[in-house]
From Swiss-Prot:
Underlying gene: lrhA
Protein name listed in UniProt: Probable HTH-type transcriptional regulator LrhA
Family designation: Belongs to the LysR transcriptional regulatory family.
Single GO BP term: regulation of DNA-templated transcription
Domain HTH lysR-type stretches: 11-68
Function of the protein: Not known, does not seem to act on the proton translocating NADH dehydrogenase genes (nuoA-N) which are part of the lrhA operon.
GO molecular function: cis-regulatory region sequence-specific DNA binding; DNA-binding transcription factor activity; sequence-specific DNA binding
PROSITE patterns found in the cross-reference section: HTH_LYSR (PS50931)
Pfam families according to UniProt: HTH_1, LysR_substrate
Alphabetic keyword roster: DNA-binding, Transcription, Transcription regulation
Residues annotated to bind DNA: 28-47
C-alpha cells in the first residue's frame, strides 16, 4: 500500500537534460560537450540524479556502462518531461506567431514523418496556417531554392541548405509476399523514372556489388511503385515504412546487398532571409527528437551506454 504522506520528488530539469544527453550521445564525454559542462561535472550530475530518485541508473559491464532497468524506465519519462517543458516555453514565447508556413514534402515523407511534424508545429504555433505541397524528391531542392516553399522535408541531403535529421530508418529490398526471386537471373527492378535519388542509389549499390539487373517496371509516382511490387512485377528498395503484410523483405540470403539507411531531413535555406522559416527550423533544432526509428547502439569496446531509444 502506498502511503499518502510519501514525499513527492521534484526532478531537476538540468539533471534530466544531461541524463538524456548521455543516453543519446552514448558517452559522458560527448554529453559534457553537448550540455557545456566538464565530464566530471556530468558524472557528478548523474550521481546526484541517482541519489534523488533513490535508484541505480547505470551499471558497469566490463568497459561499458549500461542503463539499468530503472535507468531505461526513467529515460522514457525524462524525454516526455523535457519535451513538455520545452513545448510550454516555446508556446508561450511564440504563441502569437502568425502567417502562412509552406512546407514542401517528398513522396517518401508525406505519409511517414510529415504528420508528426505538422502536429508538432500546429500544437506549438496554433495561429500559423500550414500549406503543404507534396512532390517528387528530385524537385524539392528547386522548390526551396525558388522560395516556393519555406521548409522542405526530404530524404535526399542537399549540400546548399541546412538540414536537420528528423528520423533515420533502415532501407530494405521488397517484393510481393508470394514472389519468388529467380536466382542467377538479373534482378527485376521496379523503380521511379528519372530523376530519382532512390533510383540512383539502388543502381549504384547493385553495380558496385556486380549484381546484374533489369528494369521490369518504371513508374512516375510512389503509389505506382507500391502497386507494381504488390502485383509481383519485381523488386524495389524503400525505407522500412513501406513494409506491409502483402510485402516481404529480401536480404543477403536472396543475393541482395545491404542498403544505406534513409534519412528524413527538414531543410531550410539560410540565404532566403525567411524569418518565419528560420524560427520554425530553430525551434525544431532545439526540440528533442522522439521520432527515431532505430535503437541506439554503442560501438564495441566504447565506454558508452547501451539503451533503447524511446519511440512515441
Amino acid at each position: 500500500m502506498i502511503s499518502a504522506n510519501r514525499p513527492i520528488i521534484n526532478l531537476d530539469l538540468d539533471l534530466l537534460r544531461t541524463f538524456v544527453a548521455v543516453a543519446d550521445l552514448n558517452t559522458f564525454a560527448a554529453a559534457a560537450a553537448a550540455v557545456c559542462r566538464t565530464q566530471s561535472a556530468v558524472s557528478q550530475q548523474m550521481q546526484r540524479l541517482e541519489q534523488l530518485v533513490g535508484k541505480e541508473l547505470f551499471a558497469r559491464h566490463g568497459r561499458n556502462k549500461l542503463l539499468t532497468e530503472h535507468g531505461i524506465q526513467l529515460l522514457g519519462y525524462a524525454r516526455k518531461i523535457l519535451r513538455f517543458n520545452d513545448e510550454a516555453c516555446s508556446s508561450l514565447m511564440f504563441s502569437n506567431l502568425q502567417g502562412v508556413l509552406t512546407i514542401g514534402a517528398s513522396d517518401e515523407s508525406a505519409d511517414t514523418i510529415l504528420p508528426f511534424l505538422l502536429n508538432r508545429v500546429s500544437s506549438v504555433y496554433p495561429k500559423l496556417a500550414l500549406d503543404v505541397r507534396v512532390k517528387r524528391n528530385a524537385y524539392m531542392a528547386e522548390m526551396l531554392e525558388s522560395q516556393e516553399v519555406d521548409l522542405m522535408v526530404t530524404t535526399h541531403r542537399p549540400s546548399a541548405f541546412k538540414a536537420l535529421n528528423l528520423r533515420t530508418s533502415p532501407t530494405h529490398w521488397y517484393c510481393a509476399a508470394e514472389y519468388i526471386l529467380q536466382k542467377g537471373e538479373p534482378i527485376p527492378l521496379v523503380l521511379l523514372d528519372d530523376p530519382s535519388p532512390f533510383r540512383d542509389m539502388v543502381l549504384a549499390t547493385l553495380n558496385k556489388a556486380d549484381i546484374p539487373w533489369r528494369l521490369a517496371y518504371v513508374a512516375s509516382t510512389l503509389p505506382a511503385v507500391r502497386a507494381a511490387v504488390k502485383a509481383g512485377l519485381g523488386v524495389t528498395a524503400r525505407p522500412v515504412e513501406m513494409m506491409s503484410p502483402d510485402l516481404r523483405v529480401l536480404s543477403g540470403v536472396d543475393g541482395l546487398p545491404p542498403l544505406p539507411d534513409t534519412e528524413y531531413l527538414l531543410c531550410y535555406d539560410p540565404s532566403s532571409n525567411n524569418e518565419l522559416a528560420q524560427v520554425i527550423y530553430q525551434a525544431m533544432e532545439s526540440y528533442h527528437n522522439p521520432w527515431q526509428y532505430s535503437p541506439m547502439s554503442a560501438p564495441e569496446g566504447d565506454d558508452s551506454l547501451l539503451i533503447e531509444r524511446d519511440i512515441e
